[in-house]
């Protein structure tokens, strides 16, 4: 479950939306999505190389710690963002009725939730949803490099720890007799949790804001790190009897 409740699939699925909200524009957000996939592939190969050299436990602990820190870094970056439209910006917006946004020009917002709420109220949900990337690019003042770095580190840490290593670990924890059904049940729960996270993620961004959403995921990762630190055995080179003895003790 820790795999999914850190928000990994939600971040992948809504990567373009997240990057729009950083204010880097629609085209750049698509390019950043490609970058995420590339980072994931590279660090998965790193995990394959290291898993039998370092062991499962160190990779999972290092990766989970990195996930927690990177998510909290994203949260901090979003919390420092401000949102402000100037009158001169309105002429650069490509959609009709952009002049309606004069009502909020020169007003500085310290919450993305309040800014988006006012823009939606003025333009309507339909116009906003079609032009949100353009509006946010104009209005957002944020350390985009900091947030982008946080997201890339998050993807990298997941790709060499919770992503591939957890499945190797699970295959070594269960006896052959129960391995198939156990991993099947875990896969089902994993997919179910992933679907639920992806369903609530857009609501979180809209209702709670970017900073609080990433903070929640970061705290979950911190808790996950300490749980793994406490109970996770090293399975490398150990028999089921040895693992059972370790877990019982």
What are these regions (language model features)?
Residues 1-249:
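Alpha-helical transmembrane bundle of multi-pass membrane proteins
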